[in-house]
């Protein structure tokens, strides 16, 4: 089967297409596989919490501040909740919002970045670039915290849907900025100019040329934005800006802070949710490293050394067989 190089990232195109090649390239990275395994384990853990928990996570009738035991694997908190049950239930909102923020934020960054790049040096580009610059200068989480503090003053707490769209609407600026730069670079390439000369529309150029050539960046931007969504979600509930009646890892940290768990030595109350949040972000970061290695050949030094060692072993094995 004939194969050709694919765009600026030198992917080989076969019958499976660029998406398959990206997935295959990422899967071949050991660090990315580790991140995928960790993420799958956390997702399974969170899905189990939807259908099963040892106890009702909202039940407060247990003895308070019990250390971990066979009856309560992670003990109980200062309010009589079973910590392990809350940990099970609290994972799905965090991961779900993180993925949703990553998806929506990436779509916004693609739309704004490609539009600004295709219409560079126009009024539309200047307006979009100015808006992007504002969101780059002012941290999105700070904006959400200010809005949440104002709404809290009027007794309104942020729900999951509001938090999701608030994070997505403030987490797209970095990706948009980079996407615009990539589009400007691609516009000067010969195959893009050739497609324009033969009459291909801008929509066709976007879906047939620009997006396929930027798949690694789009995937990387998704995980980067998802990390922002998870950390932003946690901060919002940790500072009490969200609805505190909802059980998630952020509210667990909020109540542990209010109960002075650290000062009282109740480590089982705050370490498990903090560890799980860090583990999710760590898995996303590992996958992102794998994507970067696929997209940037300069980061494949470790792989080159590995393949050289394998080649040397194969040569030595061949010499042994020949001499034998």
What does each model-identified segment do?
Residues 92-106, 203-234:
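Transmembrane alpha-helices
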Residues 23, 47-85:
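Short membrane-interfacial helix/loop motifs at transmembrane-helix boundaries
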């Amino acid at each position: 089967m004939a194969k050709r190089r694919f765009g600026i990232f030198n992917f080989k195109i076969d019958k499976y297409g660029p998406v398959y090649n990206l997935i295959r390239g990422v899967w071949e990275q050991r660090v990315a596989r580790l991140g995928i395994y960790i993420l799958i384990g956390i997702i399974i853990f969170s899905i189990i919490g939807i259908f099963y928990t040892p106890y009702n996570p909202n039940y407060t009738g247990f003895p308070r501040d019990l250390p971990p035991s066979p009856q309560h694997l992670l003990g109980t908190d200062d309010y009589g909740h079973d910590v392990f049950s809350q940990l099970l239930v609290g994972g799905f909102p965090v991961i779900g919002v993180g993925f949703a923020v990553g998806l929506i934020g990436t779509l916004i960054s693609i739309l704004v970045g490609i539009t600004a790049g295709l219409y560079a040096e126009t009024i539309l580009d200047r307006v979009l670039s100015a808006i992007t610059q504002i969101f780059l200068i002012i941290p999105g989480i700070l904006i959400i915290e200010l809005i949440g503090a104002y709404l809290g003053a009027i007794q309104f707490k942020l729900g999951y849907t509001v938090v999701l769209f608030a994070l997505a609407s403030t987490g797209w600026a970095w990706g948009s900025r980079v996407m615009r730069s990539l589009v400007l670079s691609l516009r000067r390439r010969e195959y893009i100019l050739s497609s324009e000369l033969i009459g291909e529309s801008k929509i066709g150029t976007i879906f047939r040329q620009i997006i396929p050539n930027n798949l690694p960046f789009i995937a990387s931007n998704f995980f980067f934005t998802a990390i922002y969504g998870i950390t932003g979600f946690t901060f919002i509930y940790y500072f009490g800006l969200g609805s505190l009646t909802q059980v998630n890892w952020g509210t667990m940290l909020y109540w542990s802070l209010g109960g002075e768990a650290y000062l009282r030595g109740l480590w089982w109350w705050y370490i498990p949710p903090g560890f799980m949040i860090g583990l999710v972000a760590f898995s996303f970061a590992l996958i992102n490293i794998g994507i970067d290695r696929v997209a940037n050949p300069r980061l494949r030094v470790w792989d080159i050394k590995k393949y050289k060692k394998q080649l040397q072993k194969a040569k030595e094995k061949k010499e042994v067989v020949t001499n034998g």
